[in-house]
């Protein structure tokens, strides 16, 4: 710990020691804080003494267990610690003590893992997760953790928590995430007092700061007479985690590898090691340091340590971005005039009276893209497109939306032009995507992306293929370019979607919605957003470390529509309606070990103690085969280095009350991970309801266009469950068996217990009256007209399958015409929903006043 550094830094800044801010239990009705705050919290000294375990059964049938305990507290230490190994013993006793310094602002969960050491490695017997908020300051706490009730296996640990002498420190927090000040260490290698270099080798220094953003860095040792600039190094680290710069002197040798290839294999030998206590260095001043490496060897470094405690380069908060708020002010004027005309109002509405309407397009590849063109055309013909504030989509719908927004005035001109251009690309051959010229283009573009530091995946290649499918030429556009299309409020505000997933969990088990807009990219769950121009750049602890060019939109289109980034389990889930049930036998168990009768355990922000018992390496191998994703888009994690707030479980988007949900495992959540794994939002819910339902957007009416071939109400049912888990107002979805058998063109859902619930107008993709009507009220007459309308969308040999990207012209126009017609044919229901949304909005305004 930076024992001396923190008091000096705090003294320089003259921070008031305000003490810890305790957040009270609240209803899960919205974000805790709309904006970030600076808060001051104390430090605590934690002593963990691992005493003993009893009745432990190992994995070796011929001998007793060789036990040791690993302790991991990632909010206080960059690496795990462990006890010694007690060999061949069922009742091992350690009596080993470990010391930590923890910060009062963050959620500190200690992981205690019991291992059985064997020749080839270590077998995990059990894992305990213990929320340190269970401890009372100043009171020793001896805890016996049950590991197996059947044979009385137990682990005994003693905790002592004391108020630290280190002064309290200030953090930036939004009530879910916490940003500590960032420590930057910069240095230059000035020379060394080591022996001369060997004839067949070269010496280099390896420098590392545990927990730093940067990996260990190798610096070549050069003679003082050698020209050129001296080698430099830089590290960024959370000062709560690291206190020391480690220096190792390495000798690099070259050995000839035996075999016909005669390749050279690099070998290194450690000649010495040393380190520098970072707290011994003055802040903001360059310091000359000499590091002893042992046996008379030393190296000279010039170092400067600085603390970054100013504003962040990302936004922590649950309010809308400035760009979106400015858009809303302008868009309300457009919507007000449109509503006056559509509903026949005597005068235009005041800005506070204008209801918020969102159009949501589901996933479905080319089918969804083509259908959304038709739905939007229908809204435009009815004069309803200007009543829409938000336009959002999943997967294929995002392809339609992102193409439209190439024109900053797209909604103000007839959509026939964009539809005709889309038809040209959808109905043309895609063989050119695999031409020699295009393959060279893909190789070149992916090479540029990889050299810029990005982790290139199959989804990046898919993005280049999507670029060809949509435009058949290079598209230089970036998402931030679309700011021009919303600056005056002339179009609805576009919200593109993806979900951050785990590589070995289904989207239904864990998916964090990530929104992409012209102004910001971010996670509403965490209240963390970066400017769109910075997506893909490297941030750590909320600070920009490495600026990268904003990715072209084709890479985002590939991510938004990456339906193939799935696992075998998810394939069965989507095709058969249920996952692979036999996998449950291979999963480990999770049990609650709390004694809920103890009064200190009733803190609503405290996570209950959980015991995880794995099934073994073979079971894990089986799970990996069936649950691992084929691919995902790996992006720099802009939340990396941030910590979870001590009361994060009160956040609206967290379901940590489900003890087995990943939200209840804070050490594994996104801020603790190096990369984001972003995939098609359809893996969670095949329509972007969660982003439209954010309380800060206050959507009154949702026009839901579902372009799936089957289960026309699945997205509504899944959204209903999603909202129920999180306490989000949503109407009751009640559908009769006859509608499940054969859906109608439009459904209005407005019944809800909570008056803040939005109205949902749902349009399944069905061919009902379009089959017999050329237009609303106009029946088909000629054989040609009847043949055009007489088709089954979801027949076994449907041309609208997910993996079909090329349509015949008639199939394309049928789909667009059907989607357009279903909107036009329900104009009265649309007007009724708008009027109801207006009435509810005004009623809420009056109640609020």
Curated annotation (Swiss-Prot):
Chain positions recorded as Ca(2+) 2 binding sites: 60, 116, 118, 123
Gene3D superfamilies linked: C2 domain, Cytosolic phospholipase A2 catalytic domain
Known EC number: 3.1.1.4
Cross-referenced InterPro entries: Acyl_Trfase/lysoPLipase, C2_cPLA2, C2_dom, C2_domain_sf, cPLA2_C2, LysoPLipase_cat_dom
Residues annotated as binding Ca(2+) 1: 60, 66, 116, 118
Cellular component GO terms held in the UniProt record: cytosol; mitochondrion; ruffle membrane; vesicle
Active site, UniProt feature: 395 (nucleophile), 680 (proton acceptor)
Chain ranges of the PLA2c domain: 306-849
Membrane topology: Peripheral membrane protein
Sequence ranges assigned to domain C2 in this UniProt record: 27-145
Keywords tagged on the record: Calcium, Cell membrane, Cytoplasm, Hydrolase, Lipid degradation, Lipid metabolism, Membrane, Metal-binding, Mitochondrion, Phospholipid degradation, Phospholipid metabolism
Highest taxon, organism lineage: Eukaryota
Subcellular location: Cytoplasm, Cytosol; Cell membrane; Mitochondrion
Matches recorded under Pfam families: C2, cPLA2_C2, PLA2_B
Cofactor(s) needed: Ca(2+)
Regulation: Stimulated by cytosolic Ca(2+).
BP term (GO), one: glycerophospholipid catabolic process
First-listed, main subcellular location of the protein, grouped into a coarse class: cytoplasm
Listed GO MF terms: calcium ion binding; calcium-dependent phospholipase A2 activity; calcium-dependent phospholipid binding; lysophospholipase activity; phospholipase A1 activity
Catalysis performed (reactions): a 1,2-diacyl-sn-glycero-3-phosphocholine + H2O = a 1-acyl-sn-glycero-3-phosphocholine + a fatty acid + H(+); a 1-O-alkyl-2-acyl-sn-glycero-3-phosphocholine + H2O = a 1-O-alkyl-sn-glycero-3-phosphocholine + a fatty acid + H(+); 1-hexadecanoyl-2-(9Z-octadecenoyl)-sn-glycero-3-phosphocholine + H2O = 2-(9Z-octadecenoyl)-sn-glycero-3-phosphocholine + hexadecanoate + H(+); 1-hexadecanoyl-2-(9Z,12Z-octadecadienoyl)-sn-glycero-3-phosphocholine + H2O = (9Z,12Z)-octadecadienoate + 1-hexadecanoyl-sn-glycero-3-phosphocholine + H(+)
Domain notes: The N-terminal C2 domain associates with lipid membranes upon calcium binding. It modulates enzyme activity by presenting the active site to its substrate in response to elevations of cytosolic Ca(2+).
Protein name per its UniProtKB record: Cytosolic phospholipase A2 zeta
Species classification: Eukaryota, Metazoa, Chordata, Craniata, Vertebrata
């Amino acid at each position: 710990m930076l024992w001396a550094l923190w008091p000096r830094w705090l003294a320089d800044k003259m921070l008031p020691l305000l003490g810890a801010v305790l957040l009270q239990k609240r209803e899960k009705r919205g974000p805790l804080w709309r904006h970030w705050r600076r808060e001051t919290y104390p430090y605590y000294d934690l002593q963990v003494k691992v005493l003993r375990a009893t009745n432990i059964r190992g994995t070796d049938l011929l001998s007793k267990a060789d036990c040791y305990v690993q302790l991991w507290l990632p909010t206080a230490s960059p690496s795990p610690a462990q006890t010694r190994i007690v060999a061949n013993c069922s009742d091992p006793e350690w009596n080993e003590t470990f010391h930590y310094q923890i910060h009062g602002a963050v959620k500190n969960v200690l992981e205690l893992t019991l291992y059985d050491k064997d020749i080839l490695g270590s077998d995990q017997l059990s894992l305990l997760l213990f929320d340190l908020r269970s401890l009372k300051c100043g009171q020793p706490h001896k805890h016996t953790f049950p590991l197996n009730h059947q044979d009385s296996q137990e682990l005994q640990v003693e905790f002592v928590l004391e108020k630290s002498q280190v002064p309290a420190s200030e953090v930036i927090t939004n009530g879910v995430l916490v940003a500590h000040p960032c420590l930057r260490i910069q240095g230059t290698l000035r020379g060394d007092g080591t022996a001369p270099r060997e004839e067949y080798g070269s010496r280099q220094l390896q420098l590392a700061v545990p927990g730093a953003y940067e990996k260990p860095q190798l610096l070549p040792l050069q003679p003082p007479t050698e020209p050129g600039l001296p080698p430099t190094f830089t590290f960024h680290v959370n000062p709560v985690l690291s206190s020391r710069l480690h220096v190792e002197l390495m000798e690099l040798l070259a050995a000839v590898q035996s075999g016909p290839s005669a390749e050279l294999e690099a070998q290194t030998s450690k000649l010495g090691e040393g380190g520098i206590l970072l707290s011994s260095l003055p802040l903001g001043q360059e310091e000359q340091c000499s590091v002893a490496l042992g046996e008379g060897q030393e190296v000279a470094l010039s170092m400067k340590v600085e603390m970054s405690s100013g504003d962040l380069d990302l936004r922590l908060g649950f309010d809308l971005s400035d760009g979106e708020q400015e858009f809303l002010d302008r868009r309300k004027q457009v919507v007000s005039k449109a509503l006056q005309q559509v509903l026949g109002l005597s005068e235009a509405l005041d800005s506070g009276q204008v209801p918020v309407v969102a159009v949501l397009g589901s996933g479905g590849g080319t089918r969804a893209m083509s259908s959304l063109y038709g739905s939007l055309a229908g809204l435009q013909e009815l004069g309803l497109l200007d009543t829409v504030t938000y336009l959002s989509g999943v997967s294929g719908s995002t392809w339609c939306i992102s193409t439209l927004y190439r024109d900053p005035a797209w909604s103000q001109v007839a959509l026939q032009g964009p539809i005709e251009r889309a038809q040209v690309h959808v109905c043309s051959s895609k063989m050119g995507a695999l031409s020699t010229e295009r393959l060279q283009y893909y190789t070149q573009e992916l090479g540029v992306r990889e050299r810029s530091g990005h982790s290139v995946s199959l989804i990046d290649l898919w993005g280049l293929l999507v670029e060809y499918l949509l435009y058949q030429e290079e598209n230089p556009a970036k998402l931030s370019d679309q700011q021009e299309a919303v600056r005056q409020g002339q179009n609805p505000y576009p919200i593109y979607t993806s979900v951050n997933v785990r590589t070995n969990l289904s989207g239904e088990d864990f998916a964090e919605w990530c929104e992409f807009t012209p102004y910001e990219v971010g996670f509403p769950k965490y209240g963390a957003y970066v400017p769109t121009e910075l997506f893909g750049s490297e941030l750590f602890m909320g600070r920009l470390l490495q600026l990268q060019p904003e990715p072209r939109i084709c890479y985002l289109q590939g991510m938004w529509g990456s339906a193939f980034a799935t696992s075998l389990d998810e394939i069965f889930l989507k095709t058969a309606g249920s996952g692979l049930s036999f996998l449950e036998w291979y999963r480990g168990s999770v049990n609650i070990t709390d004694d809920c009768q103890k009064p200190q355990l009733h803190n609503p922000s405290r996570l209950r103690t959980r015991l995880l018992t794995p099934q073994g390496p073979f079971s894990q191998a089986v799970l990996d085969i069936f649950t691992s994703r084929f691919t995902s888009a790996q992006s720099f994690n802009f939340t990396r280095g941030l910590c979870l707030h001590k009361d994060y479980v009160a956040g609206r988007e967290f379901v940590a009350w489900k003890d087995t949900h990943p939200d209840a495992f804070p050490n594994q959540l996104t801020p603790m991970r190096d990369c984001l794994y972003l995939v098609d939002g359809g893996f969670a819910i095949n329509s972007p309801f969660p982003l439209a339902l954010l309380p800060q957007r206050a959507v009154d009416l949702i026009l839901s266009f579902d372009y799936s071939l089957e289960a026309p109400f699945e997205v509504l049912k899944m959204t209903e469950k999603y909202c129920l888990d999180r306490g989000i107002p949503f109407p009751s979805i009640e559908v009769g068996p006859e509608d499940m058998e054969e859906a109608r063109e439009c459904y209005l859902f407005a019944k809800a217990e909570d008056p803040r619930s939005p109205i949902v107008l749902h349009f399944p993709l069905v061919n009902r009256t379009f089959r017999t009507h050329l237009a609303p009220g106009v029946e088909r007459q000629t054989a040609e007209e009847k043949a055009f309308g007489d088709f089954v969308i979801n027949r076994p040999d449907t041309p609208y399958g997910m993996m079909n990207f090329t349509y015949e012209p008639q199939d394309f126009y049928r789909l667009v015409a059907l989607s357009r017609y279903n909107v036009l044919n329900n104009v009265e229901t649309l007007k009724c929903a708008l009027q109801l949304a207006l009435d509810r909005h005004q009623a809420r305004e009056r109640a609020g006043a």
